Amino acid sequence: MGQLKPQKNVYAVIDLGSNSFHMLIAKSIAGGLQTIGRVKRKVRLAAGLDIDNVLSSEAMHRGWECLALFAERLQDIPKQNITIVATATLRLASNADVFKAQAEKILGHKVNVISGELEARTIYKGVAHTSSCTGSQLVIDIGGASTEVIIGKNFDALLYKSLNIGCVTYLERYFKDCKLSNANFNTAIKAARTVIDEIASEYKVKGWQIASGASGTVQAIQEIMIAQNLDELLTLEKLYTIKKQSIAYKTIAALDLPGLSEDRRLVFVSGLAILIALFESLEIEKMGLAGGALREGVLYSMLPELHNSDIRKRTIDGFIDRYHVDQKQASRVASLVLNLASEVNESWPIKALNGLPLLTAVAQLHEIGLLIEYKQYHKHSAYILKNTEMPGFSQSEHKVIVAVAKGHRSDLQKGYFDSLGANSVLAQYLVRLIRIAVILCMRRQDDVLPEFAITVKDDVLNLQFENDWLKNHPLMASELQQESKQQAKLGWKLIVN
């Protein structure tokens, strides 16, 4: 059997973190990146540091065993497409060279121990290239042995620090007995605040518009909140509530919060304590989950052609290319539905709710499911969108896009929008408009679109066509009357005349 040829458009990033080792495999395709593999192993390297920052033999062997697994996957990826970075624990360890030498032998590649500042800048790059924030953004990443705090704007990190506080080191220091009490929580929070307070004034003066968390701690808390039917934004009040709920379990071994995964349980409370300290010291009002972090930042650094591009456009263009979307029809529907949104904006504040980019995305991508088959194409479109990463759109925005794409045609059931929480009303606005736009564009020609007016009063949609237009277009008239009946099933009123 011949050797496998290296896949020139496949890239790998390995992140030797203080809590977990991660491997990200991605493919450059259609002007963007498609994740084709992720491997994560809990190594808890930082737990092997003693008081003199000597890394234990046991911790080293845990790391080497993990890297032996990773090495197999690297064999058919070009060497120049592989980057391996190590962070806080190997920055701190006095015997890091011992670990590094064996790691490089196992992997056959150089291990780059990056500085805290470079780590912070790279984390920001990963967030910037996978999020939709266009203003100033605060990014927090709680790692196993360090926490990165960054303020940036667009694609540039402006203020960045790496702090020597982490969920593994704080677990060893403040929760070593695995007991959960107000006392050890508050001791951990106070210790973290001592470190964070040194940078707090500089960060608060700089200011930010949006705060994002790029760590597993933030993701774990968000999953707990969703399990409790709360919205996805973190606030200090919610963190205090989860702290109180955690203490009720008395020990880490017994900790069983709904939504908390087993692999996060051990370091969850120490990460929570650090996050509370960050919220208190920096006076963070609310925080969402970032779409990327260090690994994604390294990956985008390897592909300069993707730098500083319109992330949402890149994402949408990738779908259009991959699923052979009829671009003329997609643009036709997008143009019409955005005009509809503009006409009703006084009654339905879609723009103020940041709904226009979501409406554009749905209009351009609602037909991707046609590649599978026509009959259920709206469901196929929604399935593809749901199960594909969408850089540039937040998790909650992604859910709205999926719901609206699925709801753009056919029957809708009561309760369809309930899972969207605070975005439910926005999604209903978008669905009502996209359904009308798709019907009006059904002939797939520009010159047959009618002149009409659309108005909203007391949540009643009124479509007014030119004299005799509906009479002269019986199929369109029939489709619109059917749509009126469909919307009525959900308590929506659509008048067509």
Swiss-Prot record:
<dbReference type="InterPro" id="IPR030673">
    <property type="entry name" value="PyroPPase_GppA_Ppx"/>
</dbReference>
<protein>
    <recommendedName>
        <fullName>Guanosine-5'-triphosphate,3'-diphosphate pyrophosphatase</fullName>
        <ecNumber>3.6.1.40</ecNumber>
    </recommendedName>
</protein>
<dbReference type="InterPro" id="IPR003695">
    <property type="entry name" value="Ppx_GppA_N"/>
</dbReference>
<dbReference type="InterPro" id="IPR048950">
    <property type="entry name" value="Ppx_GppA_C"/>
</dbReference>
<dbReference type="GO" id="GO:0015974">
    <property type="term" value="P:guanosine pentaphosphate catabolic process"/>
</dbReference>
<dbReference type="GO" id="GO:0015970">
    <property type="term" value="P:guanosine tetraphosphate biosynthetic process"/>
</dbReference>
<comment type="function">
    <text>Catalyzes the conversion of pppGpp to ppGpp. Guanosine pentaphosphate (pppGpp) is a cytoplasmic signaling molecule which together with ppGpp controls the 'stringent response', an adaptive process that allows bacteria to respond to amino acid starvation, resulting in the coordinated regulation of numerous cellular activities.</text>
</comment>
<dbReference type="InterPro" id="IPR023709">
    <property type="entry name" value="Guo-5TP_3DP_PyrP"/>
</dbReference>
<dbReference type="Pfam" id="PF21447">
    <property type="entry name" value="Ppx-GppA_III"/>
</dbReference>
<dbReference type="Pfam" id="PF02541">
    <property type="entry name" value="Ppx-GppA"/>
</dbReference>
<dbReference type="InterPro" id="IPR043129">
    <property type="entry name" value="ATPase_NBD"/>
</dbReference>
<keyword id="KW-0378">Hydrolase</keyword>
<dbReference type="GO" id="GO:0015949">
    <property type="term" value="P:nucleobase-containing small molecule interconversion"/>
</dbReference>
<dbReference type="GO" id="GO:0008894">
    <property type="term" value="F:guanosine-5'-triphosphate,3'-diphosphate diphosphatase activity"/>
</dbReference>
<comment type="similarity">
    <text>Belongs to the GppA/Ppx family. GppA subfamily.</text>
</comment>
<comment type="pathway">
    <text>Purine metabolism; ppGpp biosynthesis; ppGpp from GTP: step 2/2.</text>
</comment>
<dbReference type="InterPro" id="IPR050273">
    <property type="entry name" value="GppA/Ppx_hydrolase"/>
</dbReference>
